Regions:
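ATP-dependent helicase/translocase motor core
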Residues: 1-228, 233-252
Length: 252
């Protein structure tokens, strides 16, 4: 029976947060990921389902979904998901959970770690390429490597970076696009760089259609892809639209 190393005991006693702080985040920073701009911890995906009972409704926050890490090449351009687990689990234990989040965000690179190493799943693997693998913490891919993988996954040409990486409009508050708004906005940008002339977004009431449209217009205008824009809206929505556009377009 082999002697148990003290370091092993300490590591297995660490919480999931400790694993993130002491092993995963340092590994990401070592590979060139900017902690402020590119690394998001506990990224909220869904706030939980709403349960209706008669005339009352309540949100079940226990079933909310959030990713331990979402990596973005630029803010608002997610390229990878990482799921962290305690060291009592295997390296790949969180891959299946991370895959679900990656499908929501539609990103190709999926990772899991227990602090010992990384396990990866490549949703964009080509014939002959490995779909899943494991590698040391020190070998995590750089931002440029995952960005190239994202562009290959989306079928985007090298010359398209200017529009795809055009920053979102910010108003100095904490407000930012929700994950599905980011998905819609980025898909429109990708369609434009591929030469599509017509795009249709179908969004339900209350999902932020006006805000999403404004961000699309902002990014197209700032990237020099659109100079004359006609925005049509139902007359009942005019006051709401005016408020948003007066604030947003005061910067133009």
């Amino acid at each position: 029976m082999r002697d148990i190393d003290k370091h092993d005991i300490d590591k297995k006693e660490l919480s999931e947060t400790d694993i993130c702080d002491q092993f995963i985040t340092p590994a990401l920073k070592q590979s060139g990921w900017d902690q402020r701009r590119q690394i998001r911890r506990e990224y909220s995906l869904t706030p939980g389902p709403i349960i209706v009972r008669g005339n009352m409704s309540v949100r079940n926050k226990k079933k909310r979904k959030f990713a331990d890490y979402v990596l973005s090449y630029e803010p608002g351009v997610p390229v990878a998901v990482i799921e962290a687990k305690k060291n009592t689990h295997t390296v790949s234990h969180g891959l299946q959970q991370a895959l679900g989040y990656a499908e929501i965000l539609d990103v190709p690179s999926v990772f899991s770690s227990n602090g010992d190493a990384f396990a990866s799943h490549n949703r964009a693997a080509q014939p002959g390429q490995e779909i899943e693998s494991q590698f040391p913490l020190a070998d995590f891919p750089t931002p440029q490597e995952l960005w190239q993988g994202y562009k290959a996954y989306r079928g985007i040409e090298e010359s398209s970076d200017q529009l795809l990486l055009q920053p979102y409009h910010t108003d100095g508050t904490d407000k930012e696009p929700r994950y599905y708004q980011i998905e819609a906005i980025n898909r429109v940008m990708e369609a434009v760089v591929k030469g599509q002339q017509r795009m249709l977004l179908v969004m339900a009431t209350g999902t932020g259609k006006t805000y999403t449209t404004f961000q699309i217009i902002w990014r197209l205008w700032k990237a020099g892809k659109a100079r004359r824009i006609l925005f049509l809206v139902d007359r009942k929505r005019i006051p709401e639209v005016e408020r948003l556009f007066q604030v947003g377009f005061s910067f133009f």
